[in-house]
Swiss-Prot record:
Keyword field: Metal-binding, Nickel, Zinc
Protein name: Hydrogenase maturation factor HypA
Disulfide bonds: none
GO annotation (BP), single: protein modification process
InterPro entries (UniProt xref): Hydgase_Ni_incorp_HypA/HybF_CS, HypA/HybF
Signal peptide per UniProt: none
Biological role: Involved in the maturation of [NiFe] hydrogenases. Required for nickel insertion into the metal center of the hydrogenase.
GO molecular function list: nickel cation binding; zinc ion binding
Superkingdom per UniProt: Archaea
Binding-site residues for Zn(2+), renumbered to this chain: 73, 75, 105, 108
PANTHER family in the cross-refs: HYDROGENASE MATURATION FACTOR HYPA
Pfam families (UniProt xref): HypA (PF01155)
Length: 133
């Protein structure tokens, strides 16, 4: 389960940033997770909370915002994947998106290259400092 090692890295970043800013407590951690990151948000959240026990991030709310894959086509189109392109109601097709190298361009119909959606970014950290108490 690679979610544990990812959660460890996120935890280290969060704690380091919180300490630099004099945090007494971490209230919220918000991540942007690409749909193609091959990371399970529920498992990542569970791992983060387990790692954070006994730390200033122990009670932090762990929020994951999903980023859709983005496309680029030789016709000049760039944009995000429309869920209807992959059969939103078909769970298997939706899961297979992680393994697809290209999708049909919504403008010209040719294969468009997937250029984004693999990100995993700590978007924001909300902390409590002594001044706020």
């Amino acid at each position: 389960m690679h979610e544990y090692s990812i959660a460890c890295e996120i935890f280290e970043q969060v704690i380091e940033t919180a300490k630099v800013h004099g945090a007494l407590e971490v209230r919220h951690v918000t991540l942007e997770m690409g749909r193609l990151s091959h990371t399970n948000p529920e498992q990542l959240s569970f791992c983060f909370k387990a790692i954070a026990e006994g730390s200033i991030a122990e009670n932090a709310e762990f929020i994951v915002e999903t980023i859709p894959p983005s496309l680029e086509c030789e016709c000049g189109y760039t944009g995000t994947v429309d869920e209807t392109q992959i059969g939103k109601n078909d769970e298997l097709q939706s899961e297979l998106l992680e393994y697809i190298a290209a999708l049909e361009c919504p403008v010209c119909g040719k294969n468009a290259r997937i250029i984004g959606g693999r990100e995993l970014i700590v978007k924001s950290i909300e902390i409590e400092t002594e001044v706020e108490q």
